[in-house]
């Protein structure tokens, strides 16, 4: 029997087919492996964006201007209603101060704002019991960040009128602090959200808020107790504390001994600085233990017109700066700062819970002279500015300030 042999060319063809199949499988396997590696190694665009580091805050500053007595009653209201500008009349030249160059304006509101209550200027002049139309606050909100209510007129319409005033301020997003009765210890200090500019690690600048304790003291009718002054210690280890007292003898060029001792005690109890009003005149200043004390700024928007003493005032420009803070801690402060615009907020408790300590602030002070002669508040002339600085003894005071406080 003969064996049938396969033809050599047929066997060669089968071998080639098997080899080709093997090569294809190897190439496919290698290609699939490379695709998998590429997928794992190169995350999607969205994944890349999600892990990209965010810029960190590196510094913060708030250029803040403090003003003296403000109210919109009595003859201010008469002049306003006689003007085609109506409720915007008292504010009609404030743009000349360059509001856009400041982060915040803070003043003292010296009248309640009760809706529907109309009093003649003659009656208010006779009784010295004031009321301001709440419509003025709709204009005031364009300029002022916060007001102190610690004075001898915010309760002229009783505590009900005072509470209504607080509500109208809230409606107009104007922060407030202080109480006409210094025995109301829970209302003396409040943490406000101080508007600020924040610098970031990528070179950008954004708006933010810094928690700052503002403390209002009414000391005209009764002297604030040591207990009330000591309240500032609760805030002093955590944030800047600004005392804004309303006290002392009126229409005199310098603080008396009693007022001097009271304001100095505020520094001893934790205030970074004291910025006062009430006497209707600009008064002296001093550096006490290196801290600035401004005894009286004078009238800013007021209806007294009979001489230069009552129409000029000293706006106090304070530049709050934080330059060398821990970035993580600064970010935490800024996050809390967003929540501090409400009255009686929980900002101090949040700061304590977060274990934060006071940021390394510096404070630079200067004087912006104002003049409300001819019924309208506006920047002071060079001559009036010079007189204000002389009354304040400003050049001597700023040479005696100590770090972190300085002046110019």
What function would you assign to each model-found segment?
Residues 9-14:
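Membrane-helix interfacial "entry" motifs
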Residues 2-6, 17-22, 29-408:
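Acidic, metal/ion-coordinating pockets
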């Amino acid at each position: 029997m003969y064996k049938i042999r396969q033809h050599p060319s047929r066997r060669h063809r089968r071998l080639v087919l098997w080899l080709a199949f093997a090569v294809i499988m190897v190439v496919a396997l290698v290609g699939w492996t490379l695709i998998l590696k590429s997928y794992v190694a190169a995350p999607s665009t969205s994944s890349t964006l999600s892990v990209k580091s965010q810029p960190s805050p590196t510094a913060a500053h708030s250029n803040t201007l403090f003003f003296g007595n403000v109210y919109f009653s009595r003859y201010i209201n008469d002049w306003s209603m006689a003007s085609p500008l109506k409720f915007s009349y008292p504010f009609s030249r404030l743009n000349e101060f360059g509001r856009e160059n400041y982060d915040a304006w803070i003043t003292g509101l010296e009248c309640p704002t009760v809706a529907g209550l109309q009093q003649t200027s003659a009656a208010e002049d006779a009784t010295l019991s004031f009321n301001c139309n709440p419509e003025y606050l709709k204009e005031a909100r364009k300029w002022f960040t916060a007001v102190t209510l610690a004075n001898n007129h915010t309760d002229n319409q009783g505590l009900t009128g005072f509470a209504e005033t607080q509500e109208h301020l809230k409606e107009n997003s104007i922060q407030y602090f202080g109480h006409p009765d210094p025995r109301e210890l829970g209302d003396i200090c409040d943490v406000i959200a101080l508007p600020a500019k924040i610098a970031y690690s990528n070179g950008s600048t954004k708006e933010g808020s810094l928690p700052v304790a503002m403390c209002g003291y009414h000391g005209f009718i009764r002297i604030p107790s040591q207990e009330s002054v000591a309240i500032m210690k609760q805030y002093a280890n955590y944030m800047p504390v600004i005392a804004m007292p309303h006290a002392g003898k009126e229409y005199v060029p310098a603080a008396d001994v009693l007022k001097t001792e009271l304001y100095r005690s505020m520094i001893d109890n934790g205030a970074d600085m004291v910025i006062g009003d009430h006497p209707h005149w600009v008064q002296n200043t001093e550096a006490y233990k290196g801290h600035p004390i401004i005894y009286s700024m004078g009238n800013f928007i007021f209806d007294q017109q009979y001489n230069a003493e009552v129409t000029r005032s000293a706006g106090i420009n304070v530049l709050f700066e934080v330059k060398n803070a821990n970035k993580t801690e600064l970010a935490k402060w800024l996050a809390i700062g967003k929540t501090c615009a409400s009255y009686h907020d929980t900002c101090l408790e949040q700061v304590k819970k977060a274990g934060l300590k006071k940021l390394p602030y510096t404070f630079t002070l200067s004087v912006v002279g104002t003049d409300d002669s001819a019924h309208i508040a506006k920047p002071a002339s060079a001559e009036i500015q010079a007189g204000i600085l002389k009354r304040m003894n400003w050049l001597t005071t700023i040479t005696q300030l100590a770090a972190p406080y300085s002046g110019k």
